[in-house]
Amino acid sequence: MSLHNAQDSDAIAWAKAPTKVIDVNGVPFAYRELGPRGGVPVVFLHHFTAVMDDWDPRVLDGIARHHHVIAFDNRGVGASGSRVPADLTQMGVDAIAFIRALGRDTVDLFGFSLGGAVAQVIALREPWLVRRMVLAGTGPRGGSGIDKMARIVTSAYLKAALTRKDPRHFLFFPRTSEGKRAANDYFARLAERTDGRDKPISIQARFAQIAAIVRGGKATPDDLSVVTHPTFVANGDHDLMVASEHSEDLARRLPNSQLTIYPNSGHGGVFQYHQRFVPEVLEFLAQP
């Protein structure tokens, strides 16, 4: 892994974006960036068990056509150092420290799943740091049933072992012909990066993340009425991991939000519908 000059990434596709490293309070954080310089960057916050290679290239490349995009491995994830904390608030604190280390004082946030929960922490703790948010496949802290995700994940991992498939075939997409086709297309896109791939998620990171999610599900709900940032909430209509009604509840509780629910799709609905989702995000981010 090498450290590259900041200007190297402007015209590079996500599959070719070099991995960089920055020291954040003594911990090396791995990240990649692409897209035009200037303006407010979009910082991507990854999902449960994800490393940078798990972002859909069509989503990042699509948004990077008009915005500078930054994706990173949070503390203890993938190529970043240290250990993953079993606490959503600490994950948010770590993400804030990373953003500050890059010298950014205003960002847009794109949080998917676990990343959406982390984005909410950031907006609550340092609201002046955030301009706009895209929250996909996620719900509010203290949402009923989110703490049951450990059982859902375990079931998917068992099915994956029996079928020799990635668990996300069962967690992200419905087991319909349309959903299976979308899953296969998604994994084909993830395989487009062939060089300089990230380190896989560790066992410690998996257990810490699921512990943080369960703890967050049992927590006292946050007062989201104070989060006044414009927010685009999106999900599929059959999300097994974060029930779609939690995304609807999130949108109701955020006073300046808009909601899109994609039909015949699950937790990965924004990837299944990337051709529709990306233009909607670009339109949302283009607003002042």
What are these regions (language model features)?
Residues 165-218, 222-223:
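Conserved alpha/beta-hydrolase catalytic His-Asp/Glu region
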Residues 227, 233-235:
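Short beta-strand/loop motif that positions the catalytic acidic residue
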